[in-house]
Every structure is written in structure tokens, then in C-alpha cells.
UniProtKB/Swiss-Prot annotation:
PANTHER family: CYSTEINE DESULFURATION PROTEIN SUFE (PTHR43597:SF3), SULFUR ACCEPTOR PROTEIN CSDE (PTHR43597)
Active site: 51 (cysteine persulfide intermediate)
Name of encoding gene: sufE
Biological source species: Escherichia coli O6:K15:H31 (strain 536 / UPEC)
Record-given protein name: Cysteine desulfuration protein SufE
GO cellular component terms given for this protein: cytoplasm
Family matches, as HAMAP family: SufE
Length: 138
């Protein structure tokens, strides 16, 4: 399983894409790089409401206080969007997550302007859920 890029490399890779179709394929590729989520993690408490597809995001805090995120979806593009979100929140504490605004990153990648309204709403639901869980831990 290939590793996910860091934030800066993610942005560079997005900017190298010639058109939205290439970005779409790259998002799907990122989703394919995510490790499989265990069946027991596909539970109601990890389910994200507000997404058209089934989405699960698991948040764990390691001994150093850093949040580790895992996620899965039954839709390839959504799984890729989960990967993008995981990359953006990588190596953050709960307070870092609460304070971090992902929107400028989405704007730099021209991500949300090419998503359908339902995908954009689902992406926002993921961000809200992650921030709420992080706030509860901080």
C-alpha cells in the first residue's frame, strides 16, 4: 500500500493536473492508497451523517497526543476525498484540528468548485464531524 503524500506534495500534484478529469482520477488514486478499515470500525459511531455515500471516519489519539485518522467509503471518489482530508489533518493535535481551516487548501486545489453539491455537502459533513470529535478531545 503506497503512502499518502504530505500537504505540500498533495497541492503540487493537484496543480500539475491539466484538467478536472485528471484531478478526479488522482483523488480516486489517493482513496485506493488508504488502508482497509476494519469491519468493527464501520460502526454507527464512526459513520458520517450528511453524506450520500456510506462514510466512516475513525479518530484515535496516540500517546504523543497526535490524532490518527482512518476512513472508508463505498464510493471511490468519496474515499479519495477522505484521503485528502486525512492528508490535510495529518500529524495534528485535537486543538490543531479545531483551529485549522481547510478551505484555503480546497481553494488552492480548486477542489470544491468541481464537486457536485451533494459531494461538497458530504465533504463539509466530514470536516464538521472531524472537528467536533477533535473538540471533544481537546
Amino acid at each position: 500500500m503506497a503512502l499518502l503524500p504530505d500537504k505540500e506534495k498533495l497541492l503540487r500534484n493537484f496543480l500539475r493536473c491539466a484538467n478536472w478529469e485528471e484531478k478526479y482520477l488522482y483523488i480516486i488514486e489517493l482513496g485506493q492508497r488508504l488502508p482497509e478499515l476494519r469491519d468493527e470500525d464501520k460502526s454507527p459511531q464512526n459513520s458520517i451523517q450528511g453524506c450520500q455515500s456510506q462514510v466512516w471516519i475513525v479518530m484515535r489519539q496516540n500517546a504523543q497526543g497526535i490524532i490518527e485518522l482512518q476512513g472508508d467509503s463505498d464510493a471511490a471518489i468519496v474515499k479519495g476525498l477522505i484521503a485528502v482530508v486525512i492528508i490535510l489533518y495529518d500529524q495534528m493535535t485535537p486543538q490543531d484540528i479545531v483551529n485549522f481551516d481547510v478551505r484555503p487548501w480546497f481553494e488552492k486545489m480548486a477542489l470544491t468548485q468541481h464537486l457536485t453539491p451533494s459531494r461538497s455537502q458530504g465533504l463539509e459533513a466530514m470536516i464538521r464531524a472531524i472537528r467536533a470529535k477533535a473538540a471533544a478531545l481537546s
